[in-house]
């Protein structure tokens, strides 16, 4: 039951679509432009760096909020499996972001919300993923490649830290934690399936922080 409640809490938080709201401020639907989703990269490309930064922050914070709420609700009674419950909240939030019922299930791809998840779940993993992301970004400028690579790193580190006993759970719950993280990782790759095809074909769009670097 606790898992379902965490999923619902996360899903409700995930329904707050920062990019979509910014689009409405500009009197347009962000999903009608660029990649057709309501995420950070599309906001950056469609409305500029400021809008992209606001979208990143908003989508990141909603996942942090979902995890904070779950920790407040279950921090005392379910402390033994709290890391697992926080991942269920994150899963719900990313599902709400990617497939919002309020927007006919047309949301984003979940990367910014996943940043919030990693920050709130394990800051050490966040630091490693951030280094991996930016090292690859300044080399390739492919946001999709960087995001998926960072996700893969996060998944591997969860496996490593879980095996080391960092999360303080028994084996059954630790394996369940791995499964939830695997679902999150698989969903990220699925949502980026078109990007993956373009990467293989060499047609994926690059993102530059400065117009001076564009070719």
Regions found by a protein language model. Give the residues of each.
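Helix-coil boundary and interhelical linker segments in multi-pass alpha-helical membrane proteins
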Residues: 1-5, 67-87, 119-126, 160-179
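Canonical bilayer-spanning transmembrane alpha-helix
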Residues: 135-165, 169-170, 174-175, 187
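Short, non-helical or kinked segments that cap or interrupt transmembrane helices
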Residues: 29-40, 102-115, 142-151
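Interfacial segments of multi-pass membrane proteins
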Residues: 44-49, 70-74, 110-140, 153-162
